[in-house]
């Protein structure tokens, strides 16, 4: 997806659905240019019931985030056990582009956005 930082949430959703559908062989297949000009990818094996996994970077991309399934798990919140929806996400990054601390900051922000998705609308 090109210039994702300039798209609103509705446009991001539409383009994401289109690219995902085309990557699975529905409609016009993705071109070689679309497959190779990216800088960052998302891999969602959670929809197949995969709990957690490590995705492999496809050059020349700088990183890929792997998303696992959402499962209900016990979580301690304010010293009480609550059942919460939990999803594991892992980041694979090319350390020639950035160091691990930058990846950790990215993952923290990503987690905070998922915990409070209304922040995506700001």
Spans of features found by a protein language model:
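C-terminal catalytic/motor cores of large multi-domain enzyme assemblies
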Residues: 1-122
